[in-house]
Amino acid sequence: EETLTDAIATDEQAKEGVLVVLDKTPFYAEMGGQAADHGVITGAECVLRVQDVKKTPKGYYVHTCTLESGIVHVGDHLTARVDKEYRMAIARNHTATHLLQAALREVLGDHVHQAGSYQDASITHFDFTHFSAVTPEELVRVQKIVNDKIFESMNVTVKEMPIEEAKKLGAMALFGEKYGKVVRVVDIEGWSTEFCGGTHVKNTAQIGGFKIVSESSVAAGIRRSHRPQPADPCKPAGGYAAYRG
């Protein structure tokens, strides 16, 4: 669900940086390299604009808000609504990142693994292991593969399953990450299968298009590719490709 009603856990009269904790929330908190959802929280006497959400070590979701009107009190009942367009923009970038990793492995080799990533509504960065600069020709091949998969309109499925079952399917995990006995797996028709807790499109066609605008070294043996979110989701992102070792 994207709308839930609950009671908040703190009083606040400030206008900026208001922190709100709900018993339940439809908002995705920043984690796993994915930016948090945006949206609004409303009550009988207040309107709050949600600008960030973080999950504490104890499992509380803390919403950082701007109080646009009114005042909030302990015991108020609020309705939380996620900005669907903002979430979809992030989902496009996140699914595109999965396609990118699979394409990089196809072009550069199976030694390629994710070393870090970041996705918000505007951009995606993807850090990956590789022993040398990626050539312009290789990047063109990678980009074409990703766009081919987008235009093939491949279904994206999300399932929770025992970790051993996920491993048998060949699902890729983030190196160094600790997982429980049950994991969430994002699969793109068997072409890309990864452990992932983020938000995704339901079909690759929803991404619209893909263009790598830069590739560079960020550390020894670690490369970074960068891709902006297109202003028009039905068209590939514009920009240029820049390369440096």
Summary of predicted features, one role per range:
Residues 1-245:
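A glycine- and charged-residue-rich anion-binding loop/surface
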